[in-house]
């Protein structure tokens, strides 16, 4: 599969009122943006619907294939992330209600799959629905497991999708920098904010406070792959371990295996390549702003983005440009 390239791609704002140009220009008819309140994440279902989680709006908004908009649910408290599960249901992190909710997209029924609704740390070895979490900011899936980024407890926990039992897979609850090559469960984490899993079973952990990207291999060993640990903006085009990040908030594993890092406080989207260990900027100028719509992705200013994902069918890059209260689409170069 050829990697998507966006360096010279056109950036489109998806507004609530406007309709995009014909697809011959690489544009699609999507509706989003106007009326949004701090969009933090974007997801797509198998019926070409788009889902936007609004942290400030405490809701999930749905856009159908024709652009019609509706609210899926609006009874969250600061939701940060959403993800389609292997069962086709939509899972949402109800962050400050300390739980994960599952939505059956056929019936609209909602159930809690993890968390009691009270903040704390308990429940490993038992049902996830009876376990306490300390702020659920991100989730990830493989075929058998729901992974939960338990930020305030400085742990990543895993729920067996068959049994519903929860356990810790990374983090010992302490705040610190983990040692490379050690058992991830015995090591500290530095404010783990987001997680993602690749097809090889590697679990990536994005640390907001550690300004770094870690990875836990299938054997359970952790190591740092990006970031010096000091906040800053440097290193594009070179080794990721020599680059500076600044409060990254989201990660997404591309089909190629590369990892998109939403480098929030630098107002950019960056790509880490595990093949050669390099990092580079793919969207955003590095300066807070809102200008540049209609131009190259690298010349489009962002304002504290909190999510970046790839559309599974078109290969386009979608950015939750949170403090600009909009969603951006960057078409894949043809």
Positions of predicted regions on the chain:
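Residue-level detector of Asp-centered blade-edge/turn motifs that repeat once per structural unit
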Residues: 44-47, 84-87, 141-143, 197-200, ...
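Short loop/turn segments immediately following the C-termini of beta-strands
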Residues: 55, 95, 151-152, 208, ...
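Bacterial N-terminal signal peptides
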Residues: 7-15
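A short loop-to-beta-strand structural motif that recurs across blades of beta-propeller domains
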Residues: 58-61, 98-101, 154-158, 165, ...
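Bacterial N-terminal signal peptides that target proteins for export
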Residues: 1-7
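Conserved beta-propeller blade signature
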Residues: 49-51, 89-91, 146-148, 202-204, ...
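Gly/Pro-rich loop segments of beta-rich domains
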Residues: 22-40, 51, 56, 66-80, ...
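Blade-level signature of beta-propeller repeat domains, shared across WD40, Kelch, NHL, RCC1
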Residues: 304-334
